[in-house]
Amino acid sequence: MEFTAQQIADYLHGSVEGNPKVRLHDFAKIEEGRSGCLSFLANAKYEHYLYQTQSDAVLVNQDFEPRESVKTTLIRVPNAYTALAQLMQLVDSMKPQRKGVDSTAFVHPSVILPDDCYVGAFAYVSEGASLGTGCSLYPHVYVGSGVSVGEGTILYPHVTVYDGCSIGSRCVIHSGAVIGADGFGFAPNAEGYSKIPQLGNVIIEDDVEIGANTCIDRAVMDSTIIHRGVKLDNLVQIAHNCSVGSHTVFAAQVGMAGSSHVGEWCQFGGQVGLSGHIKVGDRVSLGGQTGLLSNVKSGSTLLGSPGMPLRDMLRASVIFPKLPDMSLRIEQLEKEISELKEICKNNKH
């Protein structure tokens, strides 16, 4: 990467305030800026770093008004955070693409391998698998029998995709993720538990990103489905027969129990937990560690365990620290009431 501030502004449909010819070759956080770096300011909490940063240019919102003099070059754009994402996507697309099959990889003879695919060292592609154009399988990836991988999809090292699963186009699956392992299905009997065969699969639609060590279990029958545009963080667990609606995002350690369904455009914070067989509507926001035991209507914002409306949870959180003292006061009041009753009783006699 090496661009002038003016080239970046032109690409982002922005304007330059300062030196349009300053050359930029790397990104840096505004508080850790260095010469030759581009930073961004999208959160007012970080504004004080703008006046001391060593970065040679900073992306700011079009309407940003500095409170002090600024030494660095400003690139004004409609939305600094979105602009940064656009620019980083451009830089990422300029990286050289790996191609070819490593000599230590195994690709079954039945697999039709597009010329521009990459299959890394010790990767294994099973019989009947289908690989789309431009896909990349990094070292030690396992692709099971009958699996389809769409065009431009990237499977990073040690990703495992079990038999019969389907991965869409332009997906990114990070290291250690497991797609299509057996769901947790056991029938109790007199001797313990009998395993229920998990005969379904997992379908991951286009433009999905899945974090490291995330697990998505195959359905008992039919499919566990991750719809288009979903983004899953690391260490997410999605059980059998679940579905996640388009463009929903999960932070780390979200867990969905079996046969639960989440709508479109939802946002779940870290360690959210869903019990089985519930439905969450569209555009639902759940704060970190929220626990759901029942269905949730579209447009809801919940927090706590069990989850409750945000306003109620905030009010309750003010009361929680006072509960021990309140309990003591109630006990004292109960004692006093009991004594008063006894006095009244004696007075009647």
From Swiss-Prot:
Coiled-coil zones: none
One Gene Ontology cellular component annotation held by this UniProt entry: membrane
Classification via Pfam families: Hexapep, LpxD
Reactions listed under catalytic activity: a UDP-3-O-[(3R)-3-hydroxyacyl]-alpha-D-glucosamine + a (3R)-hydroxyacyl-[ACP] = a UDP-2-N,3-O-bis[(3R)-3-hydroxyacyl]-alpha-D-glucosamine + holo-[ACP] + H(+)
HAMAP family listed in its UniProt record: LpxD
Similarity comment: family membership: Belongs to the transferase hexapeptide repeat family. LpxD subfamily.
Protein's UniProt name: UDP-3-O-acylglucosamine N-acyltransferase
Gene, per the UniProt record: lpxD
